Amino acid sequence: MLRTTVVLLTLAAIAFAAPTSDDIYNNVVIGDIDGAVAKSKELQKQGKGDIITEAVNRLIRDSQRNTMEYAYQLWSLEARDIVKERFPIQFRMMLGEHSIKLINKRDNLAMKLGVATDNSGDRIAYGAADDKTSDRVAWKFVPLSEDKRVYFKILNVQRGQYLKLGVETDSDGEHMAYASSGADTFRHQWYLQPAKADGNLVFFIVNREYNHALKLGRSVDSMGDRQVWGHNGNVIGNPELFGWSVVAF
């Protein structure tokens, strides 16, 4: 009888053991975001938030696609304190729709919009050679959730226009990035996948319609600016080439 009692108590202890960072990590990887959120809330309540931080750091280091879904769900379900305390500040800036700058890792250029407009009123997106401070490089991320996925519309604050990829392609099958006043297509929607480059957090910014990640072209115009394109190919594993830093404006 005593032995049975000990076994039952041991099983009960296991059943009610606090979640581990592996538990949260695995939930996020397989897409069980609800499970990850529930475990995170429990840990935060118990004063064991460092376990959450450990899981978040691993998700970022491994460039896991569902990391933003996890953060968004916490943000949306009255657990913003977890995002503020356990995630890098960039997540809070994007989910909170703060003004930010997007700095390309490879060339250290901030994204801006050109002054000229085409026949549709669209503006070309560039990496600015000499501007990291004006309103032209200020952007906001506007989150939206659909089918358990999180996408963003990316708004240029000065122009009130949303970043998109054009329809036409070049000889490499790549689409040029523009901004337009409307934002009613999947070409205007983006998902973000975190990564580490030289120890710093960057994001792959991937278009929903074409699954192309943003990059800067290799050609330089007379002002030293580079056009923004969607890359036709895999970018995972190359954050130093295709990553973007999110910096407070």
Swiss-Prot record:
Keywords: Signal. InterPro entries: Lipoprotein_11 (IPR004943), Lipoprotein_11_N (IPR042046), Ricin_B-like_lectins (IPR035992). Pfam families: Lipoprotein_11 (PF03260). The keyword Signal applies. It comes from the Eukaryota. The keyword Signal applies. Residues 1-17 form the signal peptide. One of its GO terms (cellular component) is extracellular region. Small vitellogenic protein found in females. It is synthesized in the fat body, secreted into the hemolymph, and taken up by developing oocytes. This is Microvitellogenin. The gene is MVG.
